[in-house]
Every structure is written in structure tokens, then in C-alpha cells.
Amino acid sequence: MIIKSFELNRTSLEKYNFFLFYGENNGYKEEIIQKIVQKIKIEKITYFENEILSSSEVFFNSLTSKSFFEKEKLILVNKVTDKFKNIIDEILEKNIKDITIILDADELSKKSKLRNFFEKEKSLVCTPFYQDNYQTLARLASDFFQKKQVSISREIINLIVERSN
């Protein structure tokens, strides 16, 4: 299921366990990942795709092993490509419970198997993170000044946005 990046704050994400975040806006991706980690309140375990692909048995053992102190696991996998789709298929097939997996990818083409799979499945979340445009930057600047309780005109916000590009 596709959820736009600006909709993530308004959507209840607790019912989802698999997320694919892709695109070139790494700062915003990291911000959203931190919000999810804070909501779930569990420690995240970070991997890179090549680590998992080179030793998938070790990865699956870590998924299925339960600790006495932790009930859930949050797994963040960085630099994901289409090669990781087989791993996701296997996780879904094994029906492993109490895990949340966040896949962080760079640009994925429209023909990407992983992207298409996440977009079509209702239980999986796929979110693109594109470069900020003028409107997004203006909204971010406006929100920032509102949080700091600073009164600022629209002209000054526009000037800040123009200078930031």
C-alpha cells in the first residue's frame, strides 16, 4: 500500500509491520524512522542488505530467537535493492510475529520488483521520499517558526526558501 510521506504523520502505523522507504530525501526518511522507533519504544537493530544476503541463516535465526527481556524487534535494513525481495517473501511465508521491519532504499525504479510488491500488498507500507520542493520547504519553515512561537511574515519565509535552494 502506498502512503505518501506527508500522510505518514496522520496515519496510524501501529497496525503495519513492514515498511519500504525509498527515495533521495534521506533526512526526511531518517526523521520518519526515528518517529516510528519512538512510538514503538523498542531498540532497533540495524543491518545492511549485503550483510543479510551473505548470511541469511544468521539473520533468520536472530528473527526467530526470542529474548527474555524483549517482546518485539525493530529491524532496520539499509541500502536495500530488489535482491532483498526473496528475504521478504521468506519472512512473510514463515509468518514471524512480533517484528517490525523498515527497509531503507535509495531510488527504486517503477519496474522494481520490491517496490511493486510493497505497493500492491495491503499489509505492507511503501513510501516514496522525493526531494523537497518549494511548497514543502515553505511548509517546513512555517512549521518551524510556529513551534518556536516566532511571528514571521510570508515574505520572509519565501526569502528563506529561495535562499535555501
Regions found by a protein language model. Give the residues of each.
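Conserved beta/loop motifs at nucleotide-recognition and modification sites
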Residues: M1-N165
